[in-house]
Amino acid sequence: PKDRVALQIITEAEKDELLVPHTGSWIFEGTVGSTGISLATLACAKGYRCCIVVPDDVAEEKATLLRRLGAVVEAVRPRGIVDPRHFVNEARTRAQSWKPNRHEPCARAFFADQFETDANFSAHYEHTGPEIWTQTQGHVDAFVAGTGTGGTLSGVSSYLKEVSPSVLPVAADPPGSGVYNRIQYGLMYNATEAEGTRRRHQVDTVVEGIGLNRLTRNLELGLPFIDAAERVTDDEAVRMSRWLSTHDGLFL
């Protein structure tokens, strides 16, 4: 799914002339790795350079893969999204402050902005959702997804609800995330946000990049179509990953 999102973001930027291939232009993004890997892959294929800003506790395997794909990887301390030094805000700042050199006067800098761009939602509404519906021959009772940016859950849920109102879209929410309460009760909040209990890692889970404590544009677009949410513990997630590996051959 991240390949779809990355391609949609880059394609729309090219249509809007925010990016021009083979001009020395740079793509900047703040990510825990997955979207960055897709952006770095496509940057190589389409003639761009790529700078990915990650939290410094991201899995080393992701950072290594990003570097091998040619991306410049910058690691920053994990901070809250309101902090200008949060990895997403750092990526935006780097894009805004970047200047072309005299040898590449047509080069540009583009901030992918995966959390807020409509291209994320559109990729899943226009592609992932229809692919699921087609490949299952319309036999979909429920769709369950976590929320990183909210794009997958929102885009797919919107499409499936459109073709079959009886489909049940469900958010799977990890410890520390506020999505469960937002969907069930209309309030984006988790008990770990109470005064005196806040932590360095607000979404406290072994599942990197999943969970939100703010309403992103991509999650907001899908809220009318998401029917329910379920809390999933780390133990449940790890046990299911082992089950899928053993029984379905899926390495997650």
Walk through the language-model features, giving the residues of each:
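A short, small-residue-rich loop immediately preceding and capping a beta-strand
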Residues: 19-56, 139-152, 250-252
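Positively charged, low-complexity intrinsically disordered leader regions
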Residues: 1-24
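Active-site-proximal loop->helix
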Residues: 26, 35-97, 179-192, 216-218
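Generic beta-sheet signal
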Residues: 53, 76, 114, 146, ...
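Active-site/ligand-binding-proximal alpha/beta "capping" segment
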Residues: 104-148, 155-156, 218-228, 235-250
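Buried hydrophobic packing segments
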Residues: 6-13, 39, 91, 156, ...
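Active-site/ligand-binding loops adjacent to catalytic centers
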Residues: 88-99, 108, 162-252
